[in-house]
Amino acid sequence: MVQRKSQDGKTVMVEQIGSPIRNSRIQHATLKGLGLNKMRRRRILKDTLCVRGMIAKVRHLVRVIDEG
């Protein structure tokens, strides 16, 4: 299995724009894993494949604000 490492300075800022109410427990847990649990809360995360996968699972609940 080949693992790709992120660039040292790469980060991504995400903001929660949707409520996890009426969504599955898995999506609620994914938001929690991203550090998001309230509306309009923002987090700066390392830009890794794992984080990108989590964002993709809840793309209807979050917005990517800044990639840098």
Curated annotation (Swiss-Prot):
Keywords: Ribonucleoprotein, Ribosomal protein. SUPFAM superfamilies: Ribosomal protein L30p/L7e (SSF55129). GO terms for biological process: translation. It comes from the Bacteria. One of its GO terms (cellular component) is large ribosomal subunit. CDD domains: Ribosomal_L30. The keyword Ubl conjugation does not apply. One of its GO terms (molecular function) is structural constituent of ribosome. Part of the 50S ribosomal subunit. Belongs to the universal ribosomal protein uL30 family. This is Large ribosomal subunit protein uL30.
